[in-house]
Curated annotation (Swiss-Prot):
It comes from Arabidopsis thaliana (Mouse-ear cress). Disruption phenotype: No visible phenotype under normal growth conditions. Uge2 and uge3 double mutant is almost completely sterile. Uge2 and uge4 double mutant displays a reduction in rosette and root growth, hypocotyl elongation, and secondary hypocotyl thickening. This is UDP-glucose 4-epimerase 2. Its EC number is 5.1.3.2. Optimum pH is 7.0-9.0. Pathway: Carbohydrate metabolism; galactose metabolism. It is found in: Cytoplasm.
């Protein structure tokens, strides 16, 4: 019988790609999502892409803070593990609305952990983030690097990591893997699912794709005087399909009897500048991206990229795709879905 996995936030960007990989890997997936920053359209497309495997997918519109609704789902299915993506994730908004972020992300997680314990499901993969490294003094960031988030969003990730460690310390039956991932980019090679941010994109590449399809006039590059090869900020961009595979590898690792509460970086181990990413996208799409140069944004780190040795060694996982593949698949998604899953804006059908 297929192993059954609960995926919170499974309608989101990384969640939907991971759900597809779960189904294709022989798992059954139950998704809970409140659709605050996603839509059910992504899961309908996942179901289609998965073909017959799509029969092993079900999804429910549930907020993790709604304990009775969560208990009902746990009472109906015996889960082997939970992959926890759900959470608000805009850095700027978190600064403006910290209590919203603490309530949604932390209270939601605590409720989830309580219900998991209540129903005897103590296997968890948590989506943390490289944002917990703050402004790293040294790169690459290893799992032992100091952690100090610089905004409320990052602090919710950091606090949830600590909560997970405390839960494991109190009960050694728990097996928890914390995945700190870097900058996800790209889309499923089919171009049928991808990133569809609501409102103004917070990250570089979704913004670039909206410029390319004519939804925005130009890209503003914040900071051109960093001590980097071209003066722009450097990040570790990772293909979303590699990231999805990393979650499957983490799920398999939970079967290891020696696992307690472990942290793994998921990145490529390579730093790429803003201008290098834009150039790679221009090459993949054949589109010129107009740029406006601006000063640094407060809080932006200069260079952040991952040490990936631990994940390679212990999860037997390594990112396969480079920035060319990321940009190719991103453009395939964007050009086929210029308005994302919202078909009403461009007159096409989902």
């Amino acid at each position: 019988m297929a192993k059954s996995v609960l995926v919170t936030g499974g309608a989101g960007y990384i969640g939907s790609h991971t759900v597809l990989q779960l189904l294709e890997g022989g798992y059954s997936a139950v998704v809970v999502d409140n659709y605050d920053n996603s839509s059910a359209a992504s899961l309908q497309r996942v179901k289609k892409l998965a073909g017959e495997n799509g029969n092993r997918l079900s999804f429910h519109q549930v907020d993790l803070r709604d304990r009775p609704a969560l208990e009902k789902i746990f009472s109906e299915t015996k889960f082997d593990a939970v992959i926890h993506f759900a959470g608000l994730k805009a850095v700027g908004e978190s600064v403006e609305k910290p209590l919203l972020y603490y309530n949604n992300n932390i209270v939601g997680t605590v409720t989830l952990l309580e219900v998991m314990a209540q129903y005897g499901c103590k296997n968890l993969v948590f989506s943390s983030s490289a944002t917990v490294y703050g402004w790293p003094k040294e790169v690459p960031c290893t799992e032992e690097s100091p952690i100090s988030a610089t905004n409320p969003y990052g602090r919710t990730k950091l606090f949830i990591e600590e909560i997970c460690r405390d839960v494991h310390r109190s009960d050694s039956e728990w097996k928890i893997i914390l995945l700190r991932y870097f900058n996800p980019v790209g889309a499923h090679p089919s171009g049928y699912i991808g990133e569809d941010p609501l409102g103004v994109p917070n990250n570089l590449m979704p913004y670039v794709q909206q410029v390319a399809v004519g939804r925005r006039p130009h890209l503003t590059v914040f900071g051109t005087d960093y001590k980097t090869k071209d003066g722009t900020g450097v990040r570790d961009y990772i293909h979303v399909m590699d990231l999805a595979d990393g979650h499957i590898a983490a799920l398999r690792k939970l079967d290891d009897l020696k696992i307690s509460c472990e942290v793994y970086n998921l990145g490529t181990g390579n730093g790429t500048s803003v201008l290098e990413m834009v150039a790679a996208f221009e090459k993949a799409s054949g589109k010129k991206i107009p740029l406006v140069m601006a000063g640094r944004r407060p809080g932006d780190a200069e260079v952040v990229y991952a040490s990936t040795e631990k994940a390679e060694r212990e999860l037997n996982w390594k990112a396969k795709n480079g920035i060319e593949e990321m940009c190719r698949d991103l453009w395939n998604w964007a050009s086929n879905n210029p308005y994302g899953y919202n078909s009403s804006s461009n007159g096409s059908s989902s």
